[in-house]
Design a protein with these regions (language model features):
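Bacterial Sec-dependent N-terminal signal peptides
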Residues: 1-19
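Acidic/aromatic-lined carbohydrate-recognition and catalytic surfaces
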Residues: 14-184
């Protein structure tokens, strides 16, 4: 009874951002309700230089497979969006532990290769999203390594964000906690 009635009432309400939060949407927000995204793991998509690892130039080379820019053809997937898994430098193949948020992993190419990819997407009206992992970093990220070095040299003193601002970016513990799955 009531659960179904509540669901029906909710379905009848306007569920736009403005209705939910009492604010108008900014003018420049794209309407992505009808966009089809193709998620790409660059590492395994297409290798253009024969090193066994996919790269941005390989993605550009095979972009016509995703969208050739011609609505009249039926030989592409017709996707009008690409969602790139992380492409920033990282010690792991999946790139979900970033070491530099402002760079392209060298195995994938250069910033110029990325610019070429973006230009090719723009020619085809393909929108691009990049998976940006900001809730954690690599244990090799300079912020983390500086915080660890600072804490190791601290001894029994109390850490100070004035001495090392990066200590507040992470949750450090002096003792190993039960159930902890990873030790750096």
């Amino acid at each position: 009874g009531t659960e179904s009635g509540a669901t029906d009432a909710l379905a009848q309400e306007e569920t736009s951002f403005g209705a939910l939060y009492g604010e108008a949407l900014p003018v420049d927000v794209p309407d992505d309700h009808y966009r089809t995204f193709y998620e790409v793991f660059v590492y395994s998509f297409y290798d253009s230089d024969g090193d066994g690892i996919g790269d941005l130039n390989g993605l550009v080379e095979k972009l016509d497979y995703i969208n050739d820019g011609d609505d009249a053809t039926t030989t592409d997937l017709g996707c009008n969006g690409i969602w790139l898994m992380p492409i920033m430098p990282s010690p792991t193949y999946h790139k979900y532990d970033v070491t530099d948020y402002m760079a392209i992993d060298a195995r994938y190419g250069t910033m110029e290769d990325f610019d070429r990819f973006m230009a090719a997407c723009e020619e085809r009206d393909i929108h691009v999203l990049i998976d940006l992992v900001i809730n954690h970093t690599s244990s090799k990220h300079p912020w983390f390594t500086q915080a660890v070095s600072y804490l190791q040299g601290l001894g029994d003193g109390e850490p100070s964000a004035e001495d090392c601002p990066y200590i507040d970016y992470y949750n450090f513990a002096k003792e190993k906690k039960a159930g902890s799955w990873y030790q750096v």
